[in-house]
């Protein structure tokens, strides 16, 4: 396969179809700490645009409730500022969010209110510092 000079530097946004925009918005903001981008779309559709760092999460309410129809997104992976997986699991359980058993890669999965799978990866302070240094060096 031919190569290009393009360099992908991160994910801009992920779009999820949901059954209730407000419920999903509360989940992502209150449980996972996303922020509201305060954007709007035409009045014919219900949507919410959130942010996690510089990445966006766009939630669109589907009229027929079929959030997994057609082309389903397999999952979204989130790096979580935590030193280990136990810290993530403990915090999630405090708010009633159940997680899967640990995977061989030391991650867990949770589901949002519409059943979208979310992989949670611990990302320690030292790992975050290394990533920031690598990003600065690549500029």
Q: Residues of each region from the PLM?
A:
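A general structural signal for stabilizing positions within well-ordered secondary structure
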Residues: 5, 28, 67, 109-112
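Conserved short beta-strand elements that form part of the metal-binding/catalytic scaffold
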Residues: 35-70, 117-124
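N-terminal beta-strand motif that seeds the catalytic metal site of vicinal oxygen chelate
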Residues: 1-22, 74-76, 80, 127-139
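Vicinal oxygen chelate
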Residues: 18-22, 76-117, 123-128
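Loop/turn position at the start of each blade in beta-propeller repeats
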Residues: 9, 45, 71, 103-105
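Amphipathic alpha-helical segments
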Residues: 22-36, 88-91
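Short secondary-structure junctions
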Residues: 33-40, 94-100
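Short, basic, helix/turn surface patches
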Residues: 64-68, 88, 125-136
């Amino acid at each position: 396969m031919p190569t290009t000079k393009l360099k992908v530097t991160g994910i801009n946004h992920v779009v999820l179809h949901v059954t209730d925009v407000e419920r999903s918005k509360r989940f992502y903001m209150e449980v996972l700490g996303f922020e509201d981008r305060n954007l709007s779309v035409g009045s014919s559709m219900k949507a919410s645009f959130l942010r996690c760092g510089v990445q966006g999460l766009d939630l669109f309410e589907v009229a027929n409730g079929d959030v997994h129809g057609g082309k389903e997104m397999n999952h979204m992976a989130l790096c979580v500022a935590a030193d280990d997986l136990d810290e993530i699991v403990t915090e999630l359980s405090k708010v009633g969010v159940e997680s899967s058993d640990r995977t061989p890669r030391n991650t867990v999965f949770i589901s949002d209110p519409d059943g979208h799978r979310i992989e949670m990866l611990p990302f320690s302070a030292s790992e975050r510092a290394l990533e920031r240094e690598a990003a600065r060096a690549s500029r």
